[in-house]
């Protein structure tokens, strides 16, 4: 079995780690950073950019730069109305699924495809570091992700060419990293506020056992929302002063978003931040600039509702775990957004404890995923992980009611069966509507899909016995089976109403990603070849100039001819000719170099003969200087 990497696929930033010598190691990306922005872009030349370079060009290319894709993964269009208004790229509907519009390619991407490109970069960078091809990974998801979102994350891994061995909850991964060396039992609360999601998990940790007691959260709350507070504040001030809504201009919106994120980060350490955006827009009267100061107190006031929303999941998780704040030993803070002083104050206020600051909030989740990868690969022994399902699962029954079969915070993997019957006389088929959520009415919960069981023998209502089985695997992904006990007919779920991709769509995306990877590789090779050619032409001109008359005239003419031909091939982008001429010119230069050294006076000294600059005087005993040393003591 090859190396299994752990990947924290974040909303704003992602991170990859691996077990080395029994210890988890965070792997720096090709640019040298330990975290990678979860950003994918396509340039006007149709080149793909991923990570830091994609983020850097976002202002100039807002409609073809995709970020925060995690907020759309595994969700339907009607579930992302608010999020779709806050991004600079276009969101389109394909059936009930979300598609991201890429004008420069005249193409639509699923959010899973964008996430897959981030995963591919992380796995490729890890492969370069480890010196082997990475094909297996453990990927983290927010604890409060529903079944569709988990399956969609797994699909993203598959599109990236990875076998996803396990989907693990982010707070659980953080607890693994925190508690790896802990021998004594501790009850810990993991407070995970990332770029787009918020989770709270309560765990019992000690002596290799990690048991999740409860989990709660909000998949619509994260650092992006805090940025948006600042964006709205800046835009409303500018509108009241200038009468222009900057949010309607995609380029201006992107600049505002970047400035807001920068200000938010600065305000975690400073009491005020200066926001200066020259030439943010223009009117017939001339260019307009945005310049103002934002204080920490002002920011905390703007974000007060968001900060208050962090309280409820903490209280809910403690209630579900049947624990008081006094029974919690440590508060582990995870996610970059936990650096905000107001968030730390809230945690201290609610729990009565100072948060534990010993873990790196940006890297701890990837480290935990790497540990889980080590467990699955057999590198890490004596660790038992007992996770839970975050939301209740059930079916719709008579009257539009949701009947729960597996309640939230049930330890996974788990399996449960219930027997149901028909609602009318002579009914020969039933439709099973699978739901996830905590509300009483089916319509208020998340629909995971529907499927039919046909071939039920005609009988009075209430007589047929239909056994429905829910089976949740260790990834938290659900499969459902319905069986008629009378006829023995059985049907597994074939989701028709879910937002996840079909197997055919995933397979097509895998093939597209593979072909794009080979196209990208070819582009890179061509760019490298062009760079080599340009460098060699420059070095040739420089070398000929430095050597001057030392080079034979005919040899010089030959080299100049080859150099000129290579220059022309480079400007025409004739790669076959470039390859041939590059090799020929190098050979000519080697020949010139040899001929220069063979000229009289340029030969290197024979082995064993002294250099002309060296003295022949070997020195004798007279050259030895004696010295006496005396040790002085204070």
Curated annotation (Swiss-Prot):
SUPFAM superfamilies: Actin-like ATPase domain, Heat shock protein 70kD (HSP70), C-terminal subdomain, Heat shock protein 70kD (HSP70), peptide-binding domain. Residues 622-634 have a biased composition (Acidic residues). The modification Phosphothreonine is found at residue 197. It holds the Pfam family HSP70. Residues 592-634 are annotated as: Disordered. The keyword Chaperone applies. One of its GO terms (molecular function) is ATP binding. Signal peptide: none annotated. PANTHER family: HEAT SHOCK PROTEIN 70KDA. Belongs to the heat shock protein 70 family. HAMAP family: DnaK. This is Chaperone protein dnaK2. It comes from Prochlorococcus marinus subsp. pastoris (strain CCMP1986 / NIES-2087 / MED4).
């Amino acid at each position: 079995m090859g190396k299994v990497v752990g990947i924290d696929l974040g909303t704003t930033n992602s991170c990859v780690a691996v077990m080395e010598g029994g210890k988890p190691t965070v792997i720096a990306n090709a640019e040298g950073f330990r975290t990678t922005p979860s950003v994918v872009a396509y340039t006007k030349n149709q080149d793909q950019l991923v990570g830091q370079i994609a983020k850097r060009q976002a202002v100039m290319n807002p409609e073809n730069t995709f970020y925060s894709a995690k907020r759309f993964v595994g969700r339907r269009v009607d579930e992302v109305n608010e999020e779709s208004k806050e991004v600079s790229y276009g969101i389109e509907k394909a059936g009930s699924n979300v598609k991201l519009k890429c004008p420069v390619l005249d193409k639509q991407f699923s959010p899973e495809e964008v996430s897959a490109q981030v995963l591919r970069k992380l796995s490729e960078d890890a492969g370069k570091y480890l010196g082997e091809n990475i094909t297996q990974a453990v990927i983290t998801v927010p604890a409060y992700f529903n079944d569709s979102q988990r399956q969609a994350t797994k699909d993203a891994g598959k599109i990236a060419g990875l076998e996803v061995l396990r989907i693990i909850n982010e707070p659980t991964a953080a607890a693994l990293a925190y508690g790896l060396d802990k021998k004594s039992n501790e009850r810990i609360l993991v407070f995970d506020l990332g770029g787009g999601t918020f989770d709270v998990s309560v765990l019992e940790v000690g002596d290799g056992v990690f048991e999740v007691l409860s989990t709660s959260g909000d998949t619509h709350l994260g650092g992006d929302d805090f940025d948006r507070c600042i964006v709205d504040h800046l835009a409303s001030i500018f509108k009241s002063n200038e009468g222009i809504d900057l949010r309607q201009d995609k380029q201006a919106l992107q600049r505002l978003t970047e400035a807001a994120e920068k200000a938010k980060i600065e305000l975690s350490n400073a009491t005020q931040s200066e926001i200066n955006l020259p030439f943010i827009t223009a009117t017939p009267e001339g260019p307009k600039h945005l310049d103002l100061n934002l204080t920490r107190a002002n920011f905390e006031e703007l974000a007060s509702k968001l900060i208050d929303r962090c309280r409820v999941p903490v209280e809910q998780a403690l209630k579900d775990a049947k624990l008081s704040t006094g029974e919690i030993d440590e508060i582990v803070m995870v996610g970059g957004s936990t650096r905000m002083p107001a968030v730390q104050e809230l945690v201290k206020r609610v729990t009565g404890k100072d948060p534990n600051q010993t873990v790196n909030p940006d890297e701890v989740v990837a480290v935990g995923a790497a540990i889980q990868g080590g467990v699955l690969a057999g590198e890490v022994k004596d660790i038992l992980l007992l996770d839970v399902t975050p939301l209740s699962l059930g079916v719709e029954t008579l009257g539009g009611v949701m009947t729960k079969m597996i309640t939230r915070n049930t330890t996974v993997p788990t399996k449960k069966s219930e027997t149901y019957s028909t609602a009318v006389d002579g009914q020969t088929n039933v439709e099973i509507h699978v739901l996830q959520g905590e509300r009483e009415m089916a319509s208020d919960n998340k629909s995971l899909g529907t499927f039919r069981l046909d071939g039920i023998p005609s009988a009075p209502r209430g007589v047929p016995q239909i056994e429905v089985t829910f089976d949740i695997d260790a990834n938290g992904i659900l499969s459902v089976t319905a069986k008629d006990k009378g006829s023995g007919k059985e049907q597994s779920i074939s989701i028709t109403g879910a937002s996840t991709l079909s197997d055919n769509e995933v397979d097509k995306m895998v093939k597209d990603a593979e072909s794009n990877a080979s196209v990208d590789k070819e582009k890179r090779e061509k760019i490298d070849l062009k760079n080599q050619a340009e460098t060699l032409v420059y070095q040739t001109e420089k070398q000929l100039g430095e050597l001057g008359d030392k080079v034979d005239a005919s040899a010089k003419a030959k080299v100049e001819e080859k150099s000129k031909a290579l220059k022309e091939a480079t400007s025409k982008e004739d790669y076959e000719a470039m390859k041939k001429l590059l090799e020929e010119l190098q050979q000519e230069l080697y020949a010139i170099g040899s001929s220069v050294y063979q000229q009289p006076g340029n030969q290197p000294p024979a082995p064993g003969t002294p250099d002309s600059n060296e003295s022949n005087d070997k020195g004798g005993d007279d050259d030895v200087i004696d010295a006496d040393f005396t040790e002085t003591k204070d």
